[in-house]
């Protein structure tokens, strides 16, 4: 069986977020790099660094926390893996769901690369739904 890198990213971020860790390390692949770039662009992650130890590369993510009078609270509300290696889920651009009326994002793998639901609707292309973030 192959490894599900998207599920690994989601689980690592969710676990670090629940434990109030400031940074998390994930293995480097092209899919993880493109997914993390989307998270950085959308404001869910504060910083990303590529790090190399001996022959292995990985990304170090700095999670973003907001401050209020009662202390810090998390930016991620929920992350959910949709399409799995055993059950692929595809949508055309008209059927891509809107998460919380557009407040959340859907990350898609399309023929033009990994992108958000808004970008896919603008370019009028569909693809495999990787995950929901809201």
Swiss-Prot record:
InterPro entries: Ribosomal_uS8 (IPR000630), Ribosomal_uS8_CS (IPR047863), Ribosomal_uS8_sf (IPR035987). It is found in: Plastid, Chloroplast. The keyword Ribonucleoprotein applies. One of its GO terms (biological process) is translation. It comes from the Eukaryota. The keyword Nucleotide-binding does not apply. One of its GO terms (cellular component) is ribonucleoprotein complex. One of its GO terms (molecular function) is structural constituent of ribosome. Keywords: Chloroplast, Plastid, Ribonucleoprotein, Ribosomal protein, RNA-binding, rRNA-binding. Part of the 30S ribosomal subunit. One of the primary rRNA binding proteins, it binds directly to 16S rRNA central domain where it helps coordinate assembly of the platform of the 30S subunit. Belongs to the universal ribosomal protein uS8 family. This is Small ribosomal subunit protein uS8c. The gene is rps8.
